[in-house]
A protein has these predicted regions:
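Mature extracytoplasmic or organellar-lumen-exposed domains after removal of signal/transit peptides
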Residues: 28-471
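Gram-negative bacterial Sec-dependent N-terminal signal peptides
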Residues: 1-27
Length: 471
């Protein structure tokens, strides 16, 4: 993959900050490494606005995703769907919610904004799931199935994990890299010398960039924190790190860490990668560049530099998702090994872990396919090796779906078709080949749960150096 020639310059500009966030807040200081505030640059604006940073709709969607994920374990389609399509009136924030030592400011989605997830979901066909459904149809199908059984042991599906990991890709990742950082960065789309919309105080480019940052999910002050501090915020553990303005509560609009930014921090705290820092730095420097245009159209040189920041964001964001695929392929492999020897007393517990890991693997692998880049043959290999469902103990797995579909594309009735395609050893080998694929195609570096050392021995036992993928 092509790397931006700005990367070296950007990484060289990163400085390690040793002072505490709480101290900054109490002193009323503002750091140049915080995303905002940014001044009004729009020519002719005469309103009261003084800060043009605005991405509350994106944060509300993160909250709706987290709440849908929480609702998915309860088995109510209507509750899940309300967080997916939006609802009139107040909607309680199910997650993230306050806990002892970590009070959160907002309790209602509408305190942040009133958007929906469905309208921003990738609209293309999903070849990683049976019957050529679109992404919204897949999500609706999973919510329908989750109402029947949130964890369906009969087919090995954990719908909470499938829904969460795929929605993060099909909404947040897709919207950011294939819309706001792509189409809306074009010279004739959302120009910088005009408001994003009538009455707005921010320009077209300013707001488009801010919305992409909102989908990324980092706190505005994430660059002031270590990866571990960012990680702990997402785990609701470190109020001092989260509470940048020192008011004693965590404002979800700017002080929390969501979605792929959280996963980036989880990899970076191992010390091998700097995904969160690199992406945040590129977002911040890109916003400063847009602001420096002072309400004028971006010059060719400015736009070229801006697209260099876009390249850094796209490359590293894709890697974060690929790292997640790598990690959960390793987790799934370890569960497959454990299931071969586990006693009856622990079988249900181990199988529950297996369902969770495979669901995360499947969701992230599908998310990898809805970005700006068509990953082509890599997607085909990935889909065949991951499958439509995890291999069960009788070596069967989902091979299709049969049922009745309404005119709206939603299934009225549906049941899974099961079949035997390959052996348990083949399934294990597939997980290792997925890890190798993530290294070869995306250059993943953190490599959590790396099990590749076992690949040669397993292939030898099967009697082939090739996987038994269903091709």
């Amino acid at each position: 993959m092509k790397k931006s020639n700005l990367k070296t310059k950007l990484l060289a500009s990163i400085t390690c900050l040793s002072f505490g966030v709480t101290g900054l807040a109490n002193a009323g200081a503002h750091s140049e490494d915080v995303y905002g505030p940014f001044p009004v640059t729009l020519k002719g604006y005469s309103g009261d606005c003084t800060n043009t940073v605005s991405y509350s709709g994106q944060i509300a969607r993160h909250v709706m995703h987290d709440s849908l994920k929480a609702a998915s374990t309860k088995g109510s389609y209507d509750d899940m769907n309300a967080y997916y399509v939006g609802a009139d009136g107040d909607m309680a924030i199910l997650a993230p919610s306050s806990k002892d030592g970590f009070p959160i400011k907002q309790t209602l989605v509408n305190e942040i904004s009133s958007p929906n997830l469905v309208g921003k979901t990738y609209k293309g066909t999903i070849t990683a799931w049976p019957n050529n459904m679109t992404a919204p149809e897949v999500i609706d199908f999973w919510m329908m199935k989750a109402e029947e059984n949130p964890k369906d042991v009969s087919v090995g599906l954990n719908y909470q994990q499938l829904l969460s990991k795929f929605i993060m890709g099909a909404v947040f990742y897709s919207q950011a890299v294939d819309n706001y950082l792509d189409e809306k960065m074009g010279p004739d789309s959302k120009p910088n010398d005009k408001p994003y919309k009538d009455g707005a105080c921010y320009t077209g480019k300013e707001h488009s960039w801010d919305e992409a940052f909102g989908y990324w999910g980092a706190a505005a002050h994430s660059l002031l924190l270590t990866p571990e501090q960012n990680y702990n915020i997402a785990k609701r553990k470190d109020l001092d790190a989260a509470d940048y303005n020192g008011d004693g509560v965590v404002d979800l609009k700017s002080e929390y860490v969501f979605s792929h930014a959280y996963y980036a921090s989880s990899f970076d705290k191992g010390g091998k990668t700097t995904y969160l820092n690199d992406i945040n730095r590129a977002f911040l420097d890109g916003r400063k560049l847009i602001t420096s245009a002072n309400g004028e159209k971006l010059s060719d040189a400015q736009r070229s530099e801006l697209m260099g920041y876009v390249d850094i964001i796209n490359e590293n964001w894709q890697k974060v998702i690929a790292e997640s695929v790598f990690k959960y392929a390793g987790s799934t492999y370890k569960s497959l090994v454990a299931l071969e020897t586990v006693g009856n007393a622990d079988l249900a517990k181990e199988f529950d872990k297996y369902m969770k890991y495979w669901g995360e693997l499947k969701g992230f692998s599908m998310a990898l396919q809805v970005g700006k880049e068509n990953i082509g043959e890599t997607a085909t290999k990935l889909n065949r090796m991951v499958g439509f469902g995890p291999m069960l103990l009788d070596e069967t797995q989902i091979v299709g779906i049969k049922g009745m579909m309404g005119s709206d594309g939603k299934y009225i009735t549906a049941e899974y078709e099961m079949g035997k395609i390959y052996s348990m050893n083949d399934a294990k080998l597939h997980m290792l080949k997925i890890q190798k694929l993530m290294i070869d195609q995306f250059g993943v570096e953190a490599r959590a749960n790396d099990m590749l050392a076992e690949m040669a021995d397993l292939a030898s036992k099967i009697g082939t150096s090739e996987s038994a993928e269903n091709d």
